[in-house]
């Protein structure tokens, strides 16, 4: 039986490609790719100063002998208030390298989950002007739950401006569409103006 998605705002249904929307999901791979996406978004700008970077502390705080206290050479050691931090966080990249083919497969798995649950739809993408009420009317016809991810071809077209003000809705281009966003969405609405056959999403830029 062919996989199909409703033509939201139009008539009939759009046939989905089995190679993209009929993939058996694997939880471990989806988890790995979501973790990689989240890790890559981390800025990694956290920083602490070591004892060699903090200001002051040049003078010996007290004499070497005769005080009964442990010898100290500076007040900027880690045991003093205002001293440096031992093994504190330093700027670093949290990016996780993933196999490109595995990532594309995980994205197809995520799309297949939407196809299996009938939560993916296709619309013609032709908005005469940016109107949020038109986007609301289109979603009302579909009767799907949010959060909603709308996949478009151009972030500057009228459809993008129409959908982006809706609560619990995210507008993404095909290049921006990631595994986490697909799994986060309870509904996925794809513009028919995206390059390629409407609803196939083979063109999730696999040629790049």
Task: Identify the role of each PLM range.
Residues 1-43, 88-208:
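Extended polybasic, low-complexity segments that bind anionic RNA or targeting/receptor surfaces
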Residues 49-87:
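Glycine/serine-rich anion-binding loops at beta->alpha junctions
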């Amino acid at each position: 039986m062919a996989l199909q998605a409703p033509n939201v705002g139009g008539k009939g249904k759009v046939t989905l490609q089995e190679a993209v929307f009929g993939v058996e999901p694997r939880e471990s791979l989806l988890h790995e790719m979501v973790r990689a996406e989240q890790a890559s978004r981390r800025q990694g700008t956290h920083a602490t100063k070591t004892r060699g970077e903090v200001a002051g502390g040049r003078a010996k705080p007290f004499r070497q002998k005769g005080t009964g206290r442990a010898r100290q050479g500076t007040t900027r050691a880690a045991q003093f208030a205002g001293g440096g931090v031992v093994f504190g966080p330093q700027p670093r990249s949290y990016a996780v390298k993933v196999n490109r083919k595995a990532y594309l497969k995980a994205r197809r798995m995520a799309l297949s989950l939407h196809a299996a649950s009938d939560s993916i739809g296709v619309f013609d993408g032709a908005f005469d002007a940016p109107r949020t009420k038109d986007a609301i009317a289109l979603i009302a016809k579909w009767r799907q739950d949010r959060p909603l991810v709308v996949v478009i071809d151009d972030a500057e077209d009228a459809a993008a401006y129409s959908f982006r003000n809706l609560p619990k809705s995210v507008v993404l281009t095909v290049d921006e569409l990631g595994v986490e966003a697909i799994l986060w969405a309870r509904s996925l609405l794809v513009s028919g103006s995206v390059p390629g056959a409407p609803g196939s999403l083979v063109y999730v830029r696999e040629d790049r």
